[in-house]
From Swiss-Prot:
Gene: bcsA
Keyword Membrane appears in the UniProt entry: yes
This protein's name: Cellulose synthase catalytic subunit [UDP-forming]
Cross-referenced InterPro entries: Cell_synth_A, Cellulose_synth, Glyco_trans_2-like, Glycosyltr_2/OpgH_subfam, Nucleotide-diphossugar_trans, PilZ_domain
Localization per record: Cell inner membrane
Keywords: c-di-GMP, Cell inner membrane, Cell membrane, Cellulose biosynthesis, Glycosyltransferase, Membrane, Transferase, Transmembrane, Transmembrane helix
Entry annotation: catalytic residues: 199, 343
């Protein structure tokens, strides 16, 4: 476990302060008595837990026990601090383990092979979910919340840094933002070298790098994709540290000063990761119109999971927005090339050799999210395949060099991508009873409710409290439903043959000129929606005209099916691609700006948003500017003004849109320094969403699901109209009777 006292963790109250102090004193004990005490405590705790989860209770007693635990949860949720979270975790584990013990010992008396097939399939999926739940609590219950260590030495003593910007097929208009921002980082210029690693071997990139003064590196092949590109650059550079940025990840000027302090404090630190923050919406946010309103898919990982990994010294390298110490990286043979998720595998290798990895939850760079659902799915397929490859070839639960906390964190990251089959099981399990009459639970309906409800409610409320602003309840099911069908085959193939499959590059940038429904990608969601609708029909029929003695069982399965319909309908909604007409995403920001008009007037205003093509502005004092007028925009930093020629392309009262005229390379670099590279550009948006409330989140997902059904209806009508318009009509004479 990482020393929490040295990293100044976030403290929420006196109880946490006392606990942190006790942990620090305990860590100073000699190793032998400390180990004995830990082992003895674990054994006693396990015995107590086993007694609680295995205690046989009748229906009344189980309901009473569940009610008492639920009341305790309601009280604990109102208590601030992480000790209350730990108590919630304990109650959740009790409820879930009691359920699983009862499930394995009292509900598996299947009578037919159909019951056995569906019943054991569901149990296997539930067991997987329980393991992921337990490992997830270990990861996230006590995030470290590391804070920066500021550099205390003079700049002349700071280490040398090589900045690697690997690129393959990204447009120069995207990559140049990252290049300009890397050059603008606050670091001694004689100790900072920027390298563009071009696996696309493009001459215009070479010429651009020559003009702006950065090093251009290309190789003759693309062996091992990104990992091979980075390793080739390691051979021709010599900086003490390497800062890595994907081609579309634009660093702030404070990136190195915020990140390097920990390396100078901890000589065993090999890698420090910062969040991947995105200034454009991902396909879920774009297609569902939830950008900045609902936490996106990645916010849980970068907002909470990585912070939790940091407590156990198990921070993952994520391929970008990170700093690596050169010496340990060379010691493990460079960036890992055995799998397609070279980043996570590299971190695992570093941890196995005893090096530390760290996470700093302060966004110091931002990039483009995948624009379309198809690109998003392709990216997740690569991640899933790579994690399965690591699990198969370098399993963190086996081998030397890792502590148990590290093993759990790495294993859970890999097991997470195995959700494809369990998610499909959960989405179809109630249909086994409603359609086929299979008894997947060999127990009374009321006993099922008495054990299942506490398990589900406790896990939902506990995760809601832990995840807070980084993941709203029920959205995990939506994300998994969209991806489950697509990640299942590559995961299974990678487990059987880890060498199968190649590295697919995630395309970034581009426009979607019209809205359309992606019927091809939506096929799995439509199938799931259809079979659940069929199951709903069967269930309603049984509820009205079936045996009254099975009414409660039918009602339980109908409720489950209705929930699955909400989730699958939301997945259908994601498949409706919204338009994206801007080639350059706009970033919301309020910056003071002066506008010099053609007639000599100087007006004050504030930016509303910006891109590399222009500004959205709000003029002060009720002024206005005519559309089409040419102006100069003045931005200031540290008392120095920078002027940019622009033309007003939109004007409505005090609100105007200004598009830049042709800017020189120096002006483009200065614009990036004054906008994207500002130290505080992304901090205000980090974790700023509304805290999760399960009922509100259910309404949220439910409304999206209803919208998905309407979207499907409109898309179906549109396809019918197109089909009818393409139907050829026969000339009148072909319809006449012939003699």
């Amino acid at each position: 476990m990482t020393d929490t006292t040295s990293s100044t963790p976030f403290v929420e109250g006196r109880a946490e302060q006392r606990l942190n102090g006790a942990i620090a004193r305990f860590n100073r004990w000699p190793s032998a008595p400390r180990t004995v005490l830990v082992v003895a405590s674990c054994v006693l705790g396990a015995m107590l837990l086993l007694g609680i989860i295995s205690a046989p209770l009748d229906l009344y007693s189980q309901c009473l026990f569940a009610a008492v635990c639920f009341l305790a949860v309601l009280v604990l949720r109102k208590i601030p601090g992480r000790l209350a979270i730990l108590a919630l975790v304990v109650l959740s584990l009790v409820a879930s383990l009691r359920y699983m013990f009862w499930r394995l010992t009292s509900t598996l008396g299947f009578e037919t092979w159909v019951d056995m097939f569906f019943g054991y399939g569901l149990v296997a999926a539930e067991f997987y979910a329980l393991i992921v739940l337990i490992f997830g609590y270990v990861q996230t219950a006590w995030p470290l919340r590391r804070t920066p260590v500021w550099l205390k030495t003079e700049p002349e003593e700071w280490p040398t840094v090589d900045v690697f910007i690997p690129t393959y097929n990204e447009a120069l208009s995207i990559v140049k933002l990252t290049i300009f921002a890397a050059q603008a980082m606050d670091w001694p210029k004689d100790k900072l070298r920027v390298h563009v690693l071009d696996d696309g071997r493009r001459d215009d990139f070479r010429e651009f790098c020559r003009k702006v003064g950065v090093n251009y590196i290309r190789r003759d092949n693309n062996f091992h994709a990104k990992a091979g590109n980075l390793n080739e650059a390691l051979k021709v550079t010599d900086g003490e540290y390497i800062a890595l940025f994907d081609a579309d990840h634009v660093p702030t000027r404070s990136f190195l000063q915020v990140s390097l302090g920990w390396f100078l404090k901890d000589p065993k630190l090999a890698m420090l990761q910062t969040p991947h923050f995105f200034f454009s919406p991902d396909p879920f946010e774009k297609n569902l119109d939830t950008f900045r309103a609902v936490p996106n898919e990645g916010e849980l990982f970068y907002g909470l999971v990585q912070d939790g990994n940091d407590l156990w010294n198990a921070t993952f390298f994520c391929g970008s927005c990170a700093v690596i110490r050169r010496e340990p990286l060379l010691e493990i043979g460079g960036v890992a090339v055995e799998t397609v998720t070279e980043d996570a595998h590299t971190a695992l290798k570093l941890n196995r050799l005893g090096y530390n990895t760290a996470y700093l939850a302060i966004p110091q760079a931002a990039g483009l999210a995948t624009e379309s659902l198809s690109r998003h799915i392709n990216q997740r397929i690569r991640w899933a395949r790579g994690m399965a490859q690591i699990f198969r070839t370098d399993n963190p639960l086996l081998g030397k060099g890792l502590k148990w906390g590290q093993r759990i964190c790495y294993a859970n990251a890999m097991l997470h991508f195995f959700y494809g089959l369990p998610r499909l099981v959960f989405l179809t399990a109630p249909l086994a009873y409603l359609i086929f009459g299979a008894e997947i639970f060999h127990a009374s309906a009321l006993m099922i409710v008495a054990y299942v409800l506490p398990h589900l409610v406790h896990s939902s409320l506990t995760n809601s409290r832990i995840q807070g602003r980084f993941r709203h309840s029920f959205w995990n099911e939506v994300y998994e439903t969209v991806l489950a069908w697509y990640i299942l085959p590559p995961v299974l193939v990678a487990l059987v043959n880890p060498k199968a499959g190649g590295f697919n590059v995630t395309d970034k940038g581009g426009i979607i000129d019209k809205q359309f429904f992606d019927w091809k990608l939506a096929r799995p969601y439509l199938v799931l929606l259809a079979v659940n609708l069929i199951g709903l029909g069967f269930g309603i029929h049984q509820l009205i005209w079936g045996d009254a003695s099975t009414a409660v069982t039918v009602a339980i399965n109908l409720t489950w099916t209705l929930y699955n319909l909400i989730i699958t309908s939301a997945a259908v909604a994601v498949a409706s691609e919204a338009r994206q007409v801007r080639s350059e995403p706009r970033v919301s920001a309020k910056l003071p700006v002066s506008i010099i008009c053609a007639d000599g007037r100087v007006l004050d205003g504030t930016t509303q948003d910006f891109s590399q093509n222009g500004f959205g502005l709000m003029l002060s004092d009720g002024h206005s500017i005519t559309q089409g007028e040419r102006v100069q925009l003045v931005l200031s930093r540290n008392g120095q003004d920078s002027l940019f020629d622009a033309r007003v392309v939109f004007s409505k009262g005090a609100q105007i849109g200004a598009q830049f005229e042709a800017l020189s390379l120096r002006q483009q670099s200065e614009l990036v320094r004054l906008t994207f590279s500002r130290a505080d550009t992304w901090a205000a948006s980090w974790g700023a969403g509304q805290p999760d409330t399960p009922l509100a989140a259910l309404r949220e997902v439910g409304s999206i699901g209803i919208g998905g059904l309407f979207t499907l209806g409109r898309a179906t009508l549109h396809e019918l109209r197109l089909a009818l318009s393409r139907t050829p009509t026969k000339p009148l004479d072909t319809l006449m009777d012939k003699p």
